[in-house]
């Protein structure tokens, strides 16, 4: 039985700290441990976030070390180099693979048997690295994938259509990055096909709107990084959502980074696809309808990632 009363965050940069703050507000855990190469940074973030506890649920947030992962239910890894202006997520790979080669064995040595959630970028590649190095069951090691990208898509569509984002069902799949694919053909608003709902709201130029929205969503991280040098609040909420689904065993459908086994003609590469997620990690992948163009783009996206992983010394 996994101890979902305790979570460990490895990495206390912008994303890690914002995620712990979001998790504190959610009140999901009794304990959250912060681990960072800079112990004082972890201590400072733990102190700062802890001062918000009186406004929420009682819990314990503190700096620790890898011995703390032994009895944790979830370990979240955000540690890694930051994406710089003009740098793609894939440009980060060599820096962050090296960091993971030092982190994952430390976790494995402690006999951790919970859920390992990868958030550091490039998340699809690093999820595969973590799967290979951790020795954990495949369904217990997955990445945050395109959960944030899909939320950005739903937000953009909600603004475009003046409708609640919670009523919009649409996924971005493939790479969490430049080759990501919007699954337009399966998108709907409370069961109404997206194109029909757009027409109902007075929007008829579907192709132009789809291209514009997809480009804006894909480039949103770059736009934010140019303005404030990092993105962290949106992904923190994505981490919170994934943890809620795991802890509560919601069996919700989320587009997370998983290893493919021939689905859509894609083999032995981690990409983001909709999956049922619960307390035992990934329960199953959920097939979605793709048109020929979307399928071709998905396969190209997976080819980019597979070539990169195959080039790594693991």
Which residues are covered by each model-predicted region?
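Conserved N-terminal Rossmann-fold NAD(P) cofactor-binding segment
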Residues: 31, 35-73, 87, 306-314
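C-terminal substrate-binding/catalytic lobe of Rossmann-fold NAD(P)-dependent dehydrogenases
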Residues: 134-140, 149-314
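Rossmann-like NAD(P)(H) cofactor-binding subdomain of soluble oxidoreductases
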Residues: 88-154
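Glycine-rich Rossmann-fold phosphate-binding loop(s) that bind the pyrophosphate
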Residues: 12-13
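Conserved S-adenosyl-L-methionine
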Residues: 25-31, 135-137
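N-terminal Rossmann-fold NAD(P) dinucleotide-binding loop
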Residues: 16-17
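Rossmann-like NAD(P)-binding element
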Residues: 54-115
